[in-house]
Swiss-Prot record:
Protein family: Belongs to the thioredoxin family. DsbA subfamily.
Gene Ontology terms, MF aspect: disulfide oxidoreductase activity
Domain of life: Bacteria
Gene coding for it: dsbA
Signal peptide stretch: 1-27
Keywords: Disulfide bond, Periplasm, Redox-active center, Signal
Localization annotation: Periplasm
GO cellular component: periplasmic space
Disulfide bridge partners, by residue number: C58-C61
Name the record gives this protein: Thiol:disulfide interchange protein DsbA
Matching Pfam families: DSBA, Thioredoxin
Organism for this UniProt entry: Bordetella pertussis (strain Tohama I / ATCC BAA-589 / NCTC 13251)
Length: 209
């Protein structure tokens, strides 16, 4: 039986994140995107950045993750995908730290498994202790996990992620910023996950102009 307490914890952490992207700026008619104003500077000169704003507590992000993985495998050479974990409340910050900790420990393979742990296995990955225990069960050195989780580097990346979300006017997840100039989402693409990635492809072409 599903735990009522777990459900409440997940609902609290997901508040805002479970709502598909509702743009703060005006959509461009049938073009299925919004302009980001002012445009966002790139952290990767010479490349078109595609930023995926996500939250581990968001079921829509969990659903689209396999599609994003497949899309990234065939992305053009002048495109770089960066996944950006965001927090809509203080309780979600540890999940941002979890993402960057796994990246720092060179375990990006665990990224999709976090979604599975939370949404399928119903694990309570809401604090450092629970996250550390789960990571250890996946073969991660617990001492290294704890050290990196609270490191200055991870804290800096979390802060930068929050700044990116603010600059892109993120109201919900998942959402995609392309070339620092355009934003799309499954909602803008007609409530269609695959459709959102098709719009991303179109915006990449538009960003080259």
């Amino acid at each position: 039986m599903q735990s009522t307490t777990f459900t409440r914890l997940l609902a609290a952490a997901a508040l805002g994140a479970t709502t598909l992207f509702a743009p703060a700026t005006q959509a461009q008619g049938a073009q299925q995107y919004v302009n980001i104003n002012p445009p966002m500077p790139s952290d990767t000169p010479g490349k078109i950045e595609v930023l995926e704003f996500f939250a581990y507590t968001c079921p829509h992000c969990a659903a689209i993750e396999p599609m994003v993985e497949d899309w990234a495998k065939t992305a053009p050479q002048d495109v770089v995908l960066k996944q950006v974990p965001i927090a809509f409340n203080a309780g979600m910050k540890p999940l941002q730290q979890l993402y960057y900790t796994l990246q720092a420990l060179e375990r990006p393979d665990l990224h999709p498994k976090v979604f599975t742990a939370i949404h399928t296995e119903r694990k309570r990955l809401f604090d450092k202790k629970a996250m550390g225990e789960w990571a250890a069960s996946q073969g991660v050195d617990r001492a290294k996990f704890d050290s990196v989780f609270d490191s200055f580097s991870v804290q800096t990346q979390v802060q930068h992620a929050s700044q990116l979300a603010e600059a892109a006017h993120i109201d919900g997840t998942p959402a995609f910023a392309v070339g620092g100039r355009y934003m799309t989402s499954p909602v803008l693409a007609g409530n269609d996950y695959a459709g959102a990635l098709k719009v991303v492809d179109q915006l990449i072409v538009q960003s080259r102009k």
